[in-house]
Amino acid sequence: MNNKLTALIFHGLLAIASCKWLNEKSIQNKIDEKIGKNFLGGMAKAVVHKLAKNEFMCMANMDPTGSCETHCQKASGEKGYCHGTKCKCGVPLSY
């Protein structure tokens, strides 16, 4: 039960962070308070950092919101491809 509650709180903080209501530093401080400065806390902070710098919402080579494609069409007229969590215009995945 406690693990599920922790996961729920963590996902809630990620959702709030993606809406720009809170910044990355405040979420990482909350992780330090709730989880602590241990291995699990470090992993959680790394995930928050990776998602916070994700500008076009690319996740695992997928563009669920279409933000990458829209950005590339406006910027260069090329097709947008997600490479992990990064958006690249006109550069398809090679694997």
Curated annotation (Swiss-Prot):
InterPro entries: Long_scorpion_toxin_alpha/beta, Scorpion_toxin-like_sf. Expressed by the venom gland. Its main location: secreted. One of its GO terms (biological process) is defense response to bacterium. The keyword Secreted applies. GO terms for cellular component: extracellular region. Residues 55-95 form the BetaSPN-type CS-alpha/beta domain. Belongs to the long chain scorpion toxin family. Class 3 subfamily. Has antimicrobial activity against yeasts and bacteria. This is Opiscorpine-2. It comes from Opistophthalmus carinatus. The lineage of its organism: Eukaryota, Metazoa, Ecdysozoa, Arthropoda, Chelicerata.
